[in-house]
Amino acid sequence: MDMHSGTFNPQDFAWQGLTLTPAAAIHIRELVAKQPGMVGVRLGVKQTGCAGFGYVLDSVSEPDKDDLLFEHDGAKLFVPLQAMPFIDGTEVDFVREGLNQIFKFHNPKAQNECGCGESFGV
């Protein structure tokens, strides 16, 4: 499915939603506390990489009219409606890998991922 063309009716879908682990919720709350005016984080997808799609995280000061809100322990995760067919059911985690701390996405719709982990296919 091309994200830039075609239409879908949200009423045709039974969304599972997205979930935040406690670690992801804590990190989002910390980000919001550090940036005046920020209310949460937006998770979207874009066409990129060798597998087709990549995750995009942005700070949110004002939600877009088509954003869906998923909240856990005061942490707000906004998702553009058009991204839901690609990431519905995803669990968002925040983990330490060696010296790095990163968001990890456990997406049941991801059929394949590239070797570097930067993109996925559905």
UniProtKB/Swiss-Prot annotation:
[2Fe-2S] cluster binds at C50, C114, C116. GO terms for cellular component: cytoplasm; cytosol; iron-sulfur cluster transfer complex. Changing C114S: Strong decrease of sulfur binding activity. Belongs to the HesB/IscA family. This is Iron-sulfur cluster assembly protein SufA. One of its GO terms (biological process) is response to oxidative stress. Keywords: 2Fe-2S, 4Fe-4S, Iron, Iron-sulfur, Metal-binding. Member of gene cluster sufABCDSE that mediates iron-sulfur cluster assembly under oxidative stress and iron limitation conditions. Binds [2Fe-2S] and [4Fe-4S] clusters by mobilizing sulfur atoms provided by the SufS-SufE cysteine desulfurase system and then transfers the assembled Fe-S clusters to target proteins including ferredoxin and aconitase. Seems to act as a Fe-S cluster carrier rather than a scaffold, this role being performed by SufB and SufC. [4Fe-4S] cluster binds at C50, C114, C116. One of its GO terms (molecular function) is 2 iron, 2 sulfur cluster binding. Disruption phenotype: Deletion has only a mild effect on cell growth. However, deletion of both IscA and SufA results in a severe growth phenotype in minimal medium under aerobic growth conditions. It comes from Escherichia coli (strain K12). Homodimer. Interacts with SufB and SufC. PANTHER family: IRON-SULFUR CLUSTER ASSEMBLY PROTEIN, PROTEIN SUFA.
